[in-house]
Amino acid sequence: MAQGKGFGFGLGKIKELQEAFQKAQQVQEGAKQLQDELEQMSIEGHSSDGSVTVVMSGNQEPRSVTIQPTALEKGAEELSTLVTEAMKDAYSKSTDTMRQKMEELTSGLNLPGL
């Protein structure tokens, strides 16, 4: 009677699987720390003329908006534009920071697709 080949899992495959689980655990632990770190950050965005400042967390949670009196004098439509500019700037900086931190977290782990 011929011997079966089993499931095709040799010792090498088991070791690879263990390494993959360890990497996943490292990423999970690092992601939790990163989430906490991003939550504590305050990232500022500014309008083109600097009269409006928006502060967001590293997780893109809005924290505050500061509007200089000169911006109020420009009227509702211009003020809306300035607030939008500041929000976009803060959001862009926040997502760039998050992306950079994620790259730091996953660098050296040799994860496919990252």
Curated annotation (Swiss-Prot):
Transmembrane segments: none annotated. It holds the Pfam family YbaB_DNA_bd. Keywords: Cytoplasm, DNA-binding. GO terms for molecular function: DNA binding. It is found in: Cytoplasm, Nucleoid. One of its GO terms (cellular component) is cytosol. Belongs to the YbaB/EbfC family. Homodimer. Binds to DNA and alters its conformation. May be involved in regulation of gene expression, nucleoid organization and DNA protection. This is Nucleoid-associated protein PCC7424_2224. It comes from Gloeothece citriformis (strain PCC 7424).
